[in-house]
């Protein structure tokens, strides 16, 4: 270097404290033990269908045991990964205490029956996630990201508290179960206001448009925290709607609005992802889109499908974040394979269409959805559409010879649909004790319009129509920008962390 620029050198790693170094290992083992315990709880629940509750305080039902097993499993993975990832970090013990506390709080959220306990746990969940986002407190950008997220989460918590207070004042019940039992007596105004507050709170939690900025500004979080956020924290929006399904299903207008909101975020997330230059930004926008799909399923009244979606998405996104380092490589560009032919030719089209249509039919047979003129048709349609998209991507990008490619696509996707259908049926069975498991919605012209707009916009994106507009590109780029104070633009800022 001849320009006189001084670069700070990276100092030696701090010596780990013997006592504190035992905390991460102990908490990791304890979380895995908790997961084994939750599996025993699930088994006991299936065998005896017990009424486990502390009257007016907590109530353990099918949703509780499902989410307990999922949350502790994801948390165990994150704990195990973090032991290696944070080696040498002076705040390693603090990080482990936070993710363990976060795990416990989420478990309280899905078990809480008293409305005050539910609201307090919901707030604590958001505050702990904000602390994880700002874990590297030596970065001004991390502190700014934590402040931004905290504002969103507190706002969502206030909406939850507002809805619960409104429901308490209307029903006189201080427990969630008591409120849900009395939903039938709510006035239209009360039902709309309470449901509206819960829906917006779910949108904030799940980072749906226009509340997606917090998740795109959270890239300062350590990778394990990002995995926990995208695989678990954002899912709480769906859990909120499932828990209070009797409230949000009272008015058909609310359910239709949920479908429209979900469709907008599903498409918006895909558009925003198309302009992201980095892997974490792409994963963040992918989460926005996937949570939109999850909300659509809830809006159609298929709450087990929403839970199945968020669980499977959690597995996928945890893997993607924890392996994101593998996407950053310096390699010599390779010549394009002769077998990378793209999506052209009659064979590609036939295989893609056949896989999508047969996949949708397989889902309908496995679940019984799509055989009647109700929201099940749209659910099956979106499953078919998702299968078409996945099959098209596989046919387009694979480097296998044509014969193997066309034969492998259905062999890969049909088992995946069977897994999804089996997960849907298993979760439906476990959620059978909830007040509302499935709220069949009658199809309307608006549902049809949403489907048409969804397909049209998707096709426009896939064919690259949106890339021809410079204004649209700039608009998408602006819409996907994180808060300015959260951007890490100087590599020297990383040196001491």
Language-model-detected regions and their locations in the chain:
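...captures the hydrophobic TM-helix bundle architecture rather than a specific catalytic motif
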Residues: 2-477, 481-497
